[in-house]
Design a protein with these regions (language model features):
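Extended C-terminal regions of large enzymes
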Residues: 237-240, 245, 398-415
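Short, small/polar residue-rich loop motifs at catalytic or cofactor-binding pockets
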Residues: 222, 327-330, 391-393
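Active-site rim segments in enzyme catalytic domains, especially the processed small/beta chain
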Residues: 24, 36-53, 58-60, 209-212, ...
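Extended C-terminal subregions enriched in glycine
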Residues: 339, 387, 420, 429-484
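Short, well-structured alpha-helical segments that form the helix of a local strand-helix-strand
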Residues: 24-31, 115-127, 198-200, 264-281, ...
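Noncatalytic scaffold domains of N-terminal-nucleophile
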Residues: 1-11, 15, 21-185, 190-192, ...
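Internal maturation/activation junctions in enzymes
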Residues: 256-349, 361-362, 369
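Short beta-strand scaffold segments in enzyme catalytic cores
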Residues: 42, 47-54, 331-336, 395-397, ...
Length: 517
């Protein structure tokens, strides 16, 4: 079974499973396809984080996170620009992550698919074109004035001077040629081959500090996932510099409350999850590259600390919310195969449309992940050469008796741990099916791109009595539309003890889950 936010990506992944490929091989195909058909949220110029697990007890995490350039510009202001060439401060590691995952699949999962074959769907859609999705059309119209000034953006994403609209056929021949180069010469051609030279020249011409040497130095890290026990399951999340431990901390705090005694979606259910988010996020600003800052993950997730955080929650009153907001968008996709080998992945160019910089003649849109750094020397995320920034991506995977039981993830930057907490409590505490859990009302705490208030954005279909009770508890409410895109786009695959599967993708988007029979 596969799930992704775009039907073409899900169909491509399913085809790999149907011809005997592993879940990892299916996920690589989805990763490359989604990089073509969802260009506003991810692409070759971005990063990705992967969690893999199987029935034999193997679990691992691949962190395809690009590092900052060896030589950085001198910034004079208080912050790094959010768009443009001065936000392109980091390399892009997602293509290298594809190779690392493919190598693992071959070595441990018996994968036999040729790497280049896994990119053929992406190449086809880039050459032949595909109908622009509602999501792409929405975000292009939203950002057209902001991004029009950056190199190559209008030439690629506008049609006769106007943004491509939903349903119009969108072709990317230059990106197709870049993918063909990777398929023919291998993933390292992105970093050390003729394609790398074209990328480096395109970045230099745009004003980015990333050089050919920076590309060549880019490597995916293979690390142990962070872990937390919850209601008989073991939850896996990527370690720092990602916010995966924030998701685990929320769940560890909630474990001290009997959620099963509450009605799912009730004001008290929502209140406890919101307050757990506040407690968990108190340490989130300390998350950074472990090569540059001490990251006491075991202390942050210790039973004593989580219990103290749970005791700090007042079931009858909302605490203040002072946490700064980080924007960003990404895509989640997941897969599991007939052998129970399972993959959970997030892939991103950080903000929607990344930096807005299209790299030379490659058709590659580069990420703006450099904007996640701080210019404050006292910050754990202070910008330094070779450093990886704080990272919002945190795909998840849950184990039952050491075997994959849930594959899950969502887009949404700060909202990712919040969405996942609501999703996991519905799936685990209330035993809801993926379709039901994904459709349930959700919230987003804090500022967003459209609302600068530190309010609790909550989907209006939670019901007026719930809204009234949350207001009585002291939450500053800002109701949003039912199944709002602000509340993220998540996906789930649930694996029952007997091996039967149930999967779905978020009704807030256009994605689908597909099963092989």
């Amino acid at each position: 079974m596969v799930t992704s936010p775009h039907p073409l990506a899900s169909a491509a992944g399913l085809a790999v499973l149907e011809r005997g490929g592993t879940a990892a091989e299916a996920a690589i195909t989805m990763a490359s396809t989604i990089a073509v058909v969802y260009p506003h949220f991810c692409g070759l110029g971005g990063d990705s984080v992967w969690i893999l697990a199987d029935r034999q007890g193997r679990q691992t995490c691949f962190m395809g996170i690009g590092q900052a350039a060896a030589k950085l510009p001198d910034f004079t202001g208080d912050s790094i620009p959010l768009r443009g060439p001065f936000s392109t401060l980091t390399s892009a590691a997602t293509v290298d992550a594809w190779e690392a995952v493919h190598r693992y699949s071959t070595e441990y999962w018996g994968g036999k698919q040729v790497f280049g074959d896994l990119l053929q769907d992406a190449i086809h859609h880039a050459h032949q074109g595909f109908p622009v999705s509602r999501s792409q059309g929405f975000w292009l119209d939203m950002r057209k004035d902001v991004l029009a000034e950056w190199p190559g953006f209008i030439n690629l994403f506008f049609n006769n001077g106007q943004p491509f609209a939903p349903g119009e056929i969108f072709r990317q021949p230059e990106l197709a040629r870049s993918l063909e180069d990777i398929a023919s010469h291998g993933p390292r051609s992105f970093y050390q081959g003729t394609l790398a030279q074209r990328i480096a020249e395109g970045l230099r011409a745009a004003g980015s500090p990333i050089t050919l040497a920076d590309l060549a130095a880019t490597r995916t890290m293979q690390v142990e996932p962070s872990r937390l026990s919850y209601r008989g399951l073991e939850l896996l999340a990527p370690p720092p510099p990602t916010q995966g431990i924030s998701t685990l901390a929320i769940m560890g705090i909630l474990q001290h409350f009997d959620l099963s005694a509450l009605t799912p979606g009730s004001a008290q259910h929502l209140h406890l999850v919101v307050e757990a988010v506040k407690q968990a996020f108190l340490t989130r600003d300390r998350i950074a590259d472990p090569d540059f800052a001490d990251q006491p993950v075991q202390e942050w997730l210790s039973a004593e600390r989580l219990q103290r955080a749970a005791k700090a929650i007042n079931p009858d009153r909302a605490l203040a919310w002072p946490h700064p907001y980080r924007t960003g968008d990404t895509v989640f996709f997941g897969a599991t195969d007939a052998s129970g080998q399972s993959v959970s992945t997030l892939q991103s160019t950080y903000f929607d449309w990344g930096s807005g910089v299209v790299v030379g003649d490659t058709g590659i849109l580069w990420q703006n992940r450099g904007a996640a750094f701080s210019l404050d020397p006292q910050s754990p995320n202070f910008l330094q050469p070779g450093k990886r920034p704080f990272y919002t991506l945190n795909p998840g995977l849950a184990l039952r008796d050491g075997k994959p039981a849930l594959i899950y993830g969502t887009q949404g930057a700060d909202g990712q741990p919040q969405t996942l907490a609501m999703l996991l409590t519905r799936l685990i505490d209330y035993a809801e099916a993926p379709t039901q859990a994904l459709a349930g009302p959700r919230f987003l705490l804090g500022k967003t791109f459209s609302d600068s208030r530190d309010s609790l954005k909550i989907e209006a279909d939670c019901g007026q009595p719930v809204l009234d009770r949350l207001a009585d508890l002291g939450h500053q409410l800002a109701p949003i539309e039912r199944q709002s895109p602000i509340a993220g786009q998540a996906g789930v695959i649930a694996i029952a003890p007997d091996g039967s599967l149930a999967g779905a993708h978020d009704p807030r988007g256009e994605g689908v889950a597909l099963a092989a029979y």
